[in-house]
Amino acid sequence: MGKSVVILGAQWGDEGKGKIVDLLTDRVKYVVRYQGGHNAGHTLIINGEKTVLRLIPSGMLHPNVTCLIGNGVVVSPEALMKEMGELESRGIKVRERLLISEACPLILPYHVAMDHAREAALGKKAIGTTGRGIGPAYEDKVARRGLRVGDLFNKEAFAEKLKNILEYYNFQLVNYYKVEPVDYQKTLDDVMAIADVITGMVADITTILDTARKNGEHILFEGAQGTMLDIDHGTYPYVTSSNTTAGGVATGSGFGPRNLDYVLGIIKAYCTRVGGGPFTTELFDDVGAEIARKGNEFGAVTGRPRRCGWFDAVAIRRAIQLNSISGFCMTKLDVLDGFDEVKICVAYKMPNGEIVEYAPLAAKDWEGVEPIYETLPGWKENTFRITDVNKLPQNCINYIKRIEEVTGVPIDILSTGPDRVETMILRDPFAA
């Protein structure tokens, strides 16, 4: 009997989802992206070779897997072709194994221009977007003015729609933001040059998934970003523009929610965050700097340094509620090697003195929040590349067990290094 498994970030993104998707892809027929765009940065290291995938599902490195991009994903034709080219230069037959929903909104140059113009205008109050046009493309979708993949089939109608929407954007860019307009003809020519390649990969994603389920095939849904960046449930307004939680699978792919069997939440052994927004356990001392150094905490897409802090069980409890998480995969356990002590945030003290065990929603409600920590003995032994849980230091095992206790969710997979083989699967999501 086939299983449908969701892999998603349970923190603020950058948890190591790409490696785990790649690891579990050996078991599946389909890997599906259902939200986000090329603002994702899924880093895979296989046999020492590094690959960063931003838009194409991580399953593309497995020749027997078909990769699907669902309607909830915003697609940059330029970014897609660039990524396809990189993979095809390595002999990977992308066009034979990548299928795209015709309902995917397109990201075009005016979205990118608007993204940059807005962030520049906000100055120090900027959200900290990746500047790739993701937000403006989702805005167009909701406003029902956006161009979609399906529009590429009718080139004349596309050209007319593009002209109208570009007038709307250029008016704002020139008159309000005082920046250069986006050139209509160049935008049209660039898209038309690759339109046939993209339309050649269009398919009915919902029917493919439903048929696969009925045929007993394993399906893996690959989330991007993280739970606390969800447009509705994250630390608004410091969030991304899509639903990063498990509910996004149904809306972003057309796969019925009752058909999901297991939700795997990816967590780091500590916490990180990129860009602005609240981060209760953030460390500003030498410990935080050491975690960042050992964890190589720089964004795969932006290259920006990540903010680092202790494990936040309060935020994780909210993620468990939102996603109905079945089990965790803990990554970067080895980064905590060598510390005299490690800490887990088990509650927040609110400005009014109230003690809470679940994170607030809006960013403004995090102001003045203080972390309440449990301190555990650290471990000096090296856990890097250990693949037998019985060989982990006892204090490390105690740390893992305590996180399971304070969250109420089992840790089913442990990662002790960037390569796919540096992993311990304690309970297989496809066998659970």
Swiss-Prot record:
Residues holding Mg(2+)? 14, 41
- The protein's Enzyme Commission number: 6.3.4.4
**What cofactor does this one take?**
Mg(2+)
Using the UniProt record, name the top-level EC class of this enzyme in a single word.
Answer: ligase
Q: Which residues bind GTP?
A: 13-19, 41-43, 306, 332-334, 415-417
Coarse class of the primary localization is: cytoplasm
Q: Where does IMP bind?
A: 14-17, 39-42, 130, 144, 225, 240, 304
Entry keyword annotation includes Metal-binding: yes
Its cellular-component GO annotations read:
cytoplasm
SMART domains in UniProt: Adenylsucc_synt (SM00788)
Entry's cofactor comment: Binds 1 Mg(2+) ion per subunit.
GO MF, one annotated term: GTP binding
According to the lineage, what is the superkingdom? Bacteria
Keywords assigned? Cytoplasm, GTP-binding, Ligase, Magnesium, Metal-binding, Nucleotide-binding, Purine biosynthesis
Q: Which purpose does this protein serve, as stated in its record?
A: Plays an important role in the de novo pathway of purine nucleotide biosynthesis. Catalyzes the first committed step in the biosynthesis of AMP from IMP.
Q: Name the chain's protein.
A: Adenylosuccinate synthetase
Q: What is the taxonomic lineage of the source species?
A: Bacteria, Pseudomonadati, Pseudomonadota, Gammaproteobacteria, Pasteurellales
